[in-house]
Amino acid sequence: MKSDGTFDAICNNNFGSGTPQAVKSAVLDKSKDQLIVATNAEFEPFEYMKGENYYGVDMEMAAYIAKKLGKELVIKNMNFDAVCLSVGQHKCDIAMAGLTISEDRKEYVNFSDPYYEASQRLIVKGTDTTFDACKSADDVNAILNSLTEDKKIGCQQGTTGNSFIEGSNDLGFPGLKAKAVAYKNGSLAVQDLINNGVDYVIIDAAPAERIAKAINEMS
């Protein structure tokens, strides 16, 4: 995929000047030769839906893989926490959902070589000045670590941001005193931030930028 330029083209479609390509899922049919992909289509620009079609980096890659294998593509959209488990239970063939490689997940699946290095982003209200003086990630972390138990931080359930707040020995996160409030997707977390349901939101950088841009354009 990398050697023939397909991966770069897919990245350009979703991160650059290209156009995201619609990916259709066939209906599951055990009589056919199908590639069944588990995902959680709540994570733009990696996997998301518009109407009945799937879009995003992982979904375009899934379509390419199915075509190379000569199989019909079936996409099963499920809760994020069930994605790896569904492969481990042989209900799906592969999982593609913006997954962070972790030892816990290796109990269920074998990972490919990593193809994207993600980072986390903190989303705050425009009127919040708590982090205005921060000049580095260490400055941000120092404030996050000083937050007390009464503070609430929104995140997408089961993601790296969730693990960062609650703590994870596997990923090397000591955790915060602030309470993690997990949502089905990052957009719901940010909406609750606007509605004063949480104080901050921590999610992956790519979806954070898309969500913040969309919210600001609506304001």
Kindly give the residue locations of the regions a language model identified:
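Bilobed "Venus flytrap"/periplasmic-binding protein-like clamshell domains
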Residues: 41-44, 54-67, 117-186, 205-207
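Periplasmic-binding protein-like
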Residues: 1-18, 161-164
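A short, compositionally biased domain-edge/stem linker segment
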Residues: 19-28
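Alpha-to-beta junction loops
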Residues: 70-72, 88-97, 150-152, 185, ...
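Short beta-strand->loop
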Residues: 110-117, 121, 179-181, 212-219
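Extracytoplasmic small-molecule ligand-binding "clamshell" domains
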Residues: 4, 13, 27-99, 182-183
